[in-house]
């Protein structure tokens, strides 16, 4: 099978598993507790994902509950980022619905690539704030970081505050670019060109490559003369799924 075929088969298997898990409904009490024998206590995980309990009973799918519990564990323990230096100020704590930087290749690229300037950088799609943190630790004096998702902005703010870098990074809610130009514009977009099937998948899936195309279309209008745009990483899945070799 080609890479594109393998990708679609994997997505089909994921969708089948999701349908099964979505067919199992779990009743929740007004405080998010589960009134079933030997049920786990997932109240904190529910609160982190949905906000404070309202006191009303509700029902959730097993699929959604497993997703938010997994996100809670990542948020609790965090992810060590070697590019941020020595412990303890080198961990990123992802929130529910925000991509966890467990694969650090793209972070390493930002940490190692020569900087065109240390005056200003834009971080498009800030997510957890990991790339903004790396740029600030490398000496960039000011980073303007954007995201359209309030969850991501809250996550980035919490991480940057914990890393003692919030005074160097300005967070803005925006669809792609902030106003103005910068000598460096960095973007790590969702790299899978497919439809997200749950809130947590929006950090990975970009239907129609909307964000990727928007970044490329608007980059020149937001770069200073001689500036650089870093698209990290180039999506192998995107290339394979859309390639049309000519002979």
Regions found by a protein language model. Give the residues of each.
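A short glycine-rich, Lys/Arg-flanked "PGG" loop and its adjoining helix->strand segment in the class I
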Residues: 213-225
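Conserved small/polar residues in nucleotide/adenosyl-binding loops
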Residues: 237-247
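Conserved SAM/SAH cofactor-binding pocket of Class I
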Residues: 103-187, 193
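Class I SAM-dependent transferase core
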Residues: 67-115
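Conserved beta-strand signature within the Rossmann-like core of class I S-adenosyl-L-methionine
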Residues: 227-233
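N-terminal auxiliary segments of SAM/dcSAM-dependent transferases
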Residues: 2-79
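Conserved RecA-like P-loop NTPase ATPase core
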Residues: 94, 160, 188, 215
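Mobile active-site "lid"/loop adjacent to the S-adenosyl-L-methionine
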Residues: 189-214
